[in-house]
Amino acid sequence: MAASLRLLGAASGLRYWSRRLRPAAGSFAAVCSRSVASKTPVGFIGLGNMGNPMAKNLMKHGYPLIIYDVFPDACKEFQDAGEQVVSSPADVAEKADRIITMLPTSINAIEAYSGANGILKKVKKGSLLIDSSTIDPAVSKELAKEVEKMGAVFMDAPVSGGVGAARSGNLTFMVGGVEDEFAAAQELLGCMGSNVVYCGAVGTGQAAKICNNMLLAISMIGTAEAMNLGIRLGLDPKLLAKILNMSSGRCWSSDTYNPVPGVMDGVPSANNYQGGFGTTLMAKDLGLAQDSATSTKSPILLGSLAHQIYRMMCAKGYSKKDFSSVFQFLREEETF
């Protein structure tokens, strides 16, 4: 696999790995060029919308997996493919010294690491524990302290790119932790993402992710508002989207993940807002941004409004829909 580890100048403070060439596709095929000797089992905990395709990409690169999910049905296809399924995070830690967790909330992460049957019950010294959940940076820091007491290494590595990028192996990972361990983390994360960025100490990966998702929420609401206004002014939605995407208003929410049904194929808005990134999770991430803004005394006027909107959506029946359903919410709710 052609890849490069690029070290930018000291002024930029940015260290990242970027894959320039993707390996040929193949279902669960070992296509990574690393030596077979490096393919020791990797633990993977959390097989939801993101964790499932991430784990599959590790399999495609030849890594045997030790699997756990709180919902046994989520493990079935991996078991059918020959991967080992165990009954707790502690059992994962007993069998693997490199573990990736991908969980919905801070509470889930705390339980997976510090619970009665958590990773820390059986973690081996020298193990590398990578948490790709999006959680409170303060929780990441506390988990890192507990992991360090056990002689292991913890890194936070939340992701950006959504389900589509998870499936194609083109996620962006934002990594926080001891810099000397970055190369070890990159070996695994590079099988699931095309960009692996070192952000700094533990918690900085989460900080970067929270900032990104706050901006994403704001831009999605703005795109939905602009599209709704244009449609009500008589513009064809496809034409309006085309104009926006060749103009200064262009953004990811307008050109890659448009919230208006019928404008794009292959996005949640084309499937009654099913799949994708849930409204509940966006509300959760905006809550993390709100908490961080409060603790750092940072004004986030639009971020706070976005948080209110997504909380309102959850209360009005949109909790299981993709976060781009804010367009549908604006169309149907006229009492603002």
Swiss-Prot record:
SUPFAM superfamilies: 6-phosphogluconate dehydrogenase C-terminal domain-like (SSF48179), NAD(P)-binding Rossmann-fold domains (SSF51735). Detected in skin fibroblasts. NAD(+) binds at residues 40-68, 103-104, 108, 134, 284. It catalyses: 3-hydroxy-2-methylpropanoate + NAD(+) = 2-methyl-3-oxopropanoate + NADH + H(+). It is found in: Mitochondrion. The modification N6-succinyllysine is found at residues 60, 76, 95, 141, 149, 238, 242, 297, 321. The active site is at 209. Its main location: mitochondrion. The modification N6-acetyllysine is found at residues 60, 76, 121, 145, 149, 238, 242, 321. GO terms for biological process: valine catabolic process. One of its GO terms (cellular component) is mitochondrial matrix. Transmembrane segments: none annotated. Keywords: Acetylation, Branched-chain amino acid catabolism, Mitochondrion, NAD, Oxidoreductase, Transit peptide. The keyword GTP-binding does not apply. Its EC number is 1.1.1.31. Homodimer. Belongs to the HIBADH-related family. 3-hydroxyisobutyrate dehydrogenase subfamily. PANTHER family: 3-HYDROXYISOBUTYRATE DEHYDROGENASE, MITOCHONDRIAL (PTHR22981:SF7), 3-HYDROXYISOBUTYRATE DEHYDROGENASE-RELATED (PTHR22981). This is 3-hydroxyisobutyrate dehydrogenase, mitochondrial. The gene is HIBADH.
